Amino acid sequence: MKTLLLTLVVVTIVCLDLGYTRKCLNTPLPLIYKTCPIGQDRCIKMTIKKLPSKYDVIRGCIDICPKSSADVEVLCCDTNKCNK
């Protein structure tokens, strides 16, 4: 009985995320993401217009979402891997 209880505790610890962590995409590839540091609990996707048909996209974690401008479109979100 003790072995079963210990096994359940270990499985619970392994399967559950014991701390709050946000996971955000940080590359254009959909399967590559990083765990955000403490305090950065939002995901961001910034599209920077360089030339009429060329764009840079930056993805990652952020604490405060900046405002968009004429040359930069900013999208912030609050769920895991939401910055596609």
From Swiss-Prot:
Extent of the signal sequence: 1-21
Subcellular location: Secreted
Disulfide bonds: 24-43, 36-61, 65-76, 77-82
Gene Ontology cellular-component terms listed: extracellular region
Pfam families referenced in this protein's UniProt entry, alphabetically: Toxin_cobra-type
Protein keywords: Cardiotoxin, Disulfide bond, G-protein coupled receptor impairing toxin, Secreted, Signal, Toxin
GO terms, molecular function: toxin activity
Function (record text): Acts as a beta-blocker by binding to beta-1 and beta-2 adrenergic receptors (ADRB1 and ADRB2). It dose-dependently decreases the heart rate (bradycardia), whereas conventional cardiotoxins increases it. At 100 mg/kg, intraperitoneal injection into mice provokes labored breathing, impaired locomotion, lack of response to external stimuli, and death (after 30 minutes).
Miscellaneous comment in the UniProt entry for this protein: Negative results: does not affect blood coagulation and does not show significant hemolytic activity.
Protein name: Beta-cardiotoxin CTX9
Organism: Ophiophagus hannah (King cobra)
